[in-house]
Design a protein with these regions (language model features):
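Conserved catalytic/acceptor-binding region of the Class I
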Residues: 130-203
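Conserved Class I S-adenosyl-L-methionine
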Residues: 183-259
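A short acidic, Gly/Pro-enriched loop at the edge of an enzyme's catalytic core
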Residues: 98-110
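Short catalytic micro-motifs in class I SAM-dependent methyltransferases
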Residues: 115
């Protein structure tokens, strides 16, 4: 199931989607007692924001994504970092049974899902994953802050207004970061037999117009990208200019389900 995150969108995603703080990976190691003998699976891996740094902590990581272009950028990121223990597989959450057949039941220390669970059938996924992970292992659902256009700041409100004028529709789409979605995921994990916990990491980031625009474009399907990128950037820049600096207070949620 390709989602339209190919071509230029994959480039924007690779360049402008920030990675996760080291404390996130420290938490995964602690919660799931990960060792250099473990295998991890990163579902909906995109261009490797979780996959590549996680490779430093385990024996091998399998990055799974429906878009070959995203995987190609992830492979490039792994090569640049010297991570030779990552495999990149075209697939979706529906392919977890095939992963179980290939890797074996109880073969995986952790299955990570970084800001991608809203694309998946989470109830079915958690039930399938429960047999894939070893005792003490489990699932980690990660969010890396609220979407740029939905934050509680003057610059974010100006961005949202400009996007809504351009799109002609409300700029919604919480990407599973809202409390209602998180509560739904917690219940689903518990229903699949996992021991549920929530961890948080906070940090502050300062953006410029280029990174704001790049972040927005990384979230659009390729057929919705503006035809005139320069004009789009100038439009967003004019909307944001009175509201600088563009400071973002990021709350990373690490929702874990331990078997």
């Amino acid at each position: 199931m390709a989602l339209g995150f190919r071509g230029d969108v994959a480039d924007y995603y690779h360049r402008y989607r920030r990675g996760y703080p080291p404390e996130v990976f420290d938490a995964l190691v602690e919660v799931f007692a990960l060792t250099p003998d473990d295998v991890a699976v990163d579902l909906g891996c995109g261009t490797g924001q979780v996959t590549v740094p996680l490779a430093d902590r385990v024996r091998a990581v399998v990055g799974v994504d429906p878009e070959p272009d995203m995987l190609a950028r992830g492979r490039r990121a792994a090569a640049e970092r010297g991570a030779v223990n990552v495999s990149w597989v075209v697939g979706t959450d529906a392919d977890v049974p095939a992963l179980r057949a290939a890797l074996g039941d109880g073969a995986v220390g952790v299955v990570t899902i970084g800001q991608a669970l809203h694309w998946m059938r989470h109830d079915d996924l958690f039930r399938e994953v429960s047999s894939l992970v070893r005792p003490g292992g489990g699932v980690a659902v990660l969010t890396n802050g609220t979407p740029l256009w939905l934050q509680d700041s003057d610059w974010s409100r100006a961005l949202r207004e400009s996007l809504e004028q351009w799109l002609g529709t409300p700029a919604g789409g919480t990407c599973g970061t809202d409390e209602e979605s998180q509560e739904r995921y917690r219940r689903s994990l518990a229903g699949a037999g996992f021991q549920v916990a929530v961890h948080g990491v906070d940090y502050t980031d300062t953006l410029d117009v280029e990174s704001v625009v790049g972040g927005v474009l990384s979230a659009l399907p390729v057929d919705r990208l503006p035809s005139d990128r320069l004009a789009f950037t100038e439009r967003i820049g004019r909307a944001l200019e009175p509201h600088g600096p563009f400071t973002e207070h990021v709350h990373v949620t690490v929702l874990t389900g331990q078997r």
